[in-house]
């Protein structure tokens, strides 16, 4: 589970869980970026765990349909495996971020190994943005990473990776939570593919219909 995520008993993730699952984590880590102060109808779509040679291009095509830009937090190992897809993300005008080389859980990894893994990813991902996998990073790791990176979290986590997700309920809930400056997390990964292909087109249509645009993270 993601940091701060409530365990769900049933198959439906309710709006209260989506809204408050990271609230306590935001309270204890106010120095991380959870949303962007915005007066204009701008949001920040983000995608974790790619690049994937089939799913990432699908995402890029959906974004292009609406003229949206986004930020992709990439796993270094996937960049090495799929450099053409990674370069396509950049060539189509999107921003990238470091998501470690091997998708490490900071709560289960010693600090030295974690920092080395971030540095290994930096060899193939040129960025000043970092997002910890699962949202899990301890104090020691955070202190080192913050010297080189802005650590970007979220205020809307779609849970698209969950096989228990009720897709239609999730769509309704994430649209309710959307506000100017929201940072929204999707995943361009095999685990999330089915939910992503349902949610992303409809969510982008919602954004466009409500005069929102999606931009790269600043």
Where are each of the predicted segments found?
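CE4/NodB-like, metal-dependent polysaccharide N-deacetylase domain
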Residues: 60-69, 94-95, 101-104, 111-139, ...
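Catalytic grooves of carbohydrate-active enzymes
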Residues: 174-218
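Alpha-helical scaffolding within the catalytic cores
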Residues: 28-31, 57, 79-90, 132-142, ...
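Acidic-and-aromatic substrate-binding clefts and catalytic sites of carbohydrate-active enzymes
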Residues: 50-54, 73-82, 104-112, 131-138, ...
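A cross-domain feature marking catalytic cores of carbohydrate-active enzymes
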Residues: 47-49, 74-76, 98-100, 132-134, ...
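N-terminal pre-catalytic segment of deacetylase/amide-hydrolase enzymes
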Residues: 1-45, 51-65, 81-82, 202-206, ...
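His/Asp/Glu-enriched short active-site or ligand-binding loop at hydrolase and phosphoryl-transfer sites
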Residues: 6, 10-13, 136-175, 211-218
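Short, well-structured secondary-structure segments
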Residues: 44-47, 55-80, 87-90, 94-100, ...
């Amino acid at each position: 589970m993601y940091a701060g995520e409530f365990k769900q008993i049933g198959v439906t993730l309710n709006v209260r869980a989506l809204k408050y699952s990271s609230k306590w984590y935001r309270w204890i880590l106010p120095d991380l970026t959870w949303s962007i102060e915005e007066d204009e109808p701008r949001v920040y779509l983000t995608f974790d765990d790619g690049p994937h040679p089939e799913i990432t291009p699908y995402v890029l095509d959906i974004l292009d349909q609406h003229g949206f830009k986004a930020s992709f937090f990439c796993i270094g190992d996937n960049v090495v495996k799929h450099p053409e897809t990674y370069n396509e993300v950049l060539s189509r005008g999107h921003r990238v971020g470091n998501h470690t080389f091997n998708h490490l859980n900071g709560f289960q990894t010693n600090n030295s190994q974690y920092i080395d893994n971030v540095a290994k990813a930096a060899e193939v991902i040129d960025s000043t943005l970092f997002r910890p996998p699962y949202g899990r990073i301890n104090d020691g790791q955070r202190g080192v990473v913050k010297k080189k990176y802005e650590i970007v979290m979220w205020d809307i986590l779609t849970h698209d990776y969950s096989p228990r997700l009720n897709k239609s309920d999730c769509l309704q809930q994430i649209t309710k939570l959307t506000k100017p400056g929201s940072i929204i997390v999707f995943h361009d990964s095999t685990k999330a593919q089915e939910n992503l292909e349902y949610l992303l087109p409809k969510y982008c249509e919602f954004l466009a219909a409500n005069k929102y645009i999606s931009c790269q993270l600043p």
